[in-house]
Amino acid sequence: MLDTIESYIKSHKEKENLYVKKNVSIIGSPLAAGQPLGGVQLACDDLRKLGLHNVIDVLGWKYEDIGNIDNGDNEMKQEKKTNNYINNNDNNNDNNNDNNNDNNNNCYIPNGVIKEKKHDLSNNKMNGYVNHNFYGNYEENNVISTNDKYKNNCYYDNIRNIKEIGIFSKNLFDTMSNELRKKNFVLNIGGDHGVAFSSILSSLQMYQNLRVIWIDAHGDINIPETSPSGNYHGMTLAHTLGLFKKKVPYFEWSENLTYLKPENTAIIGIRDIDAYEKIILKKCNINYYTIFDIEKNGIYNTICTALEKIDPNSNCPIHISLDIDSVDNVFAPGTGTVAKGGLNYREINLLMKILAETKRVVSMDLVEYNPSLDEVDKKVHGDSLPILDNATKTGKLCLELIARVLGYDIV
C-alpha cells in the first residue's frame, strides 16, 4: 500500500507545470474604462475578500499578491499640461457626416507628423452605426491584415477613454512582465477585458511560442472602424492580434512588441457576435468555436480539437483569457454584458480542468466579474474550498475556476 502511495506522489510530481514554479503572482487590474458600467473595477478586491488567498494556499501553491495596478490618475493629471496630441477635427462639428471631404479623417496626429490624404474607413460611420457600404470598402481596402499594424501615422480618435486605458495598460504590462520573469504563474484579475492586451503581450514577450485560449460570449474582435460603441473591451482581441490599421494614442509603448498570431489563438464559447465581427473572424484565420459547436460536439471534444489546432505538438505554453460572461447567467449573473445560452457549470469547470491537465498554463486573465450585479449564493455540501459562506454566486464560481486551473479536482 505504501509503495502505491509513493508511486502516486512521484507520478504527481512528475506532472507539475512544465514552465512555471508552483507560485502564483496575483495582479489586480481594476480597469473599468473599456466599458460603460461601474462595478467591474471592484472584482479584484472582492475575490480577495471571498477567500482567494486561502483557495490558492489550500491547493499547495505559494502566492505573492502584487496588489492592484495604478489606474494612472496621477500620470494623467500631469500629462494634461504636456499633452502632445491634437484632434484635427476640433474645428469641425460634423465629423461623422459622410459628406465630409478627405481632409476629415477622424484621427489624432502627433505634433510634427504630416497628415496623409487617403481614404479612411471611419468615414463610413454615421451616428454611431456602420454604414452598409462598409461591406464593399471592407474587402476593397483589405482592412483585416495581421502584422500590418501602424503602417501609417494616422491615429484613431473614436476609442472611448483611450488615455486612461493606454496609461493603465503600460503599468500592467511592466508589472506583469516583471512577475513572468520570476517564472511564476501570473493571475491577472480584471477589470474589464481590456486588460488582456497587456497580459497577453507581456506573456508573449516571455514565451514567444505562446498559445492563447480566449473564452468569451463575445468576439471582442471589432476594430475601431467597425465598433458600434467605441468601447475598448469589444476590440481588445483585435488589438492584440495587430489588426488595427492606425496608431492608438497612448499605446506607442507597444508598437515594437511581438503581437499575437491568429493561428495561435482559439476562441471558445462565442454566441453574441456583431455583424462585422463575423467578417473579421472568417477573414483573419483565427480558430473559433461557437456555443453551437460545443452543444454539438461536447466541451471535451471542442477544447481538445482547439488545442490540437493551435498546438499540434502539445508543447507550447498557454495563456487563458477567461471572460466570466462566457458562462450562462444562471450560474454567473454578476457580469455586465449578459447573453443567453452560455456555458453551464459543468462545462466551464471541465474546460478549466482540461487546460490545467496540459501542465502548460503560464498565465490567466479572469475578467468582467461585476460584484455590484451579483447575487448571494447558498453554500451546499460540495463546496469544499475555503470560500466565505455568504459568497456571491459569480464570485464563488470565479474562485472555483481559478482553483481548477491550479489543479483542484474531484479526486
From Swiss-Prot:
What Pfam families does the annotation carry?
Arginase
The annotated modulation of its activity is: Feedback inhibition by product L-ornithine,. Inhibited by 2(S)-amino-6-boronohexanoic acid (ABH); however, with less efficiency than human ARG1.
Which domain of life does the protein's organism represent?
Eukaryota
Q: What pH dependence of activity is documented?
A: Optimum pH is 8.5-9.
Q: Which residues make up the binding site for Mn(2+) 2?
A: D216, H218, D323, D325
**Which positions in this protein are listed as binding L-arginine?**
N222, S229, D274
Q: What is known to happen upon mutating H381A? A: 2.5-fold decrease in affinity for L-arginine
The record's GO CC annotations read: cytoplasm; cytosol
Cystine bridges: none
Give the protein's cofactors.
Answer: Mn(2+)
Catalysed reaction(s) here are:
L-arginine + H2O = urea + L-ornithine
The reported result of mutating D220A is:
Loss of catalytic activity. Loss of oligomerization
What happens when you mutate H233A?
A: Loss of catalytic activity. Loss of oligomerization
Q: In which pathway does it act?
A: Nitrogen metabolism; urea cycle; L-ornithine and urea from L-arginine: step 1/1
Which residues are involved in binding Mn(2+) 1? H193, D216, D220, D323
Alphabetical keyword list: Arginine metabolism, Hydrolase, Manganese, Metal-binding
- Give temperature effects on activity: Stable up to 57 degrees Celsius.
Q: How does it assemble?
A: Homotrimer; oligomerization is dependent on Mn(2+) binding.
Entry similarity comment: Belongs to the arginase family.
The function of this protein is: Catalyzes the hydrolysis of L-arginine into urea and L-ornithine, which is a precursor for polyamine biosynthesis. May play a role in parasite intra-hepatic development during the host liver stage.
Quote the protein name from its UniProt record. Answer: Arginase
Q: What is the organism field in this record?
A: Plasmodium falciparum (isolate 3D7)
